[in-house]
Amino acid sequence: RKEYYRVVKNNIQHTKFKDMPGDRFEQLQRFAPYMQYHGRKPLKLQNGPILLVTPSEKPCQFYNIDRDKWVSDTVAEIRKYTKREIIVRNKGLRPARIKENSVAAQCMRDQIWAVVTYQSMAALEAMHYGIPAFTMAPNCVDSLANKSLEAIEDPHYPEYAEFVKLLHYLAYCQYRLDEMRSGLAWKLIEGEKLYDEAIKG
């Protein structure tokens, strides 16, 4: 059962972040010890395939993309720059993508080199696990993820402190239902301006 829910004002995901205290992230770690962050994984342990995580139906509709075409086009683009195996991971229902089925678990099991996705939370999961991510549309790791697949063999990975700063911010964007009912979520979002500028239609 989910305890925390992402709350975003003016967007579908947070795409920017700023300095925030670490208290809510520490609270998240007490609830879910696997949220502890240990930094970049050693390259020798993660020198395997590319994991391509496909978008689900909702973002495909929102961004007006054809999932199958995106997969074939992205595989073709990756092939220009690497001979690594490409594993395609389809986004299933929540039970099929948590615990031993999580992105992090697959990254460890298959020694994944990097994760490529459209705008899935898989990018955050991969970077939290300790490997680089590539994203193609706005998402919560926008400012730290790789954008060009030309860098697939030499990807950027943020400094430890930089990624922790993002985790602290995102923890201030996750709330329990009781925090929403009490008004705390809205108070923090408005008081700390935890949102992007409004999308112009």
Spans of model-derived segments:
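Donor nucleotide-activated moiety binding/catalytic core segment of transferases
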Residues: R79, R84-F134, P138-N139
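Conserved catalytic-core segment of nucleotide-activated headgroup transferases in glycan assembly
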Residues: G39-P95
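A short, gly/pro- and small-residue-rich
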Residues: R1-H14, S72, H128-D142
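Glycine-rich loops and low-complexity Gly/Arg-rich segments
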Residues: V75-I78, C140-S143, P158-Y160
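Short catalytic/ligand-binding loop motif for oxyanion handling, primarily in non-cytosolic enzymes
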Residues: E3, P59-F62, R94-R97, L124-E125, ...
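Leloir-type glycosyltransferase catalytic cores
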Residues: Y4-N47, Y63, L144-G201
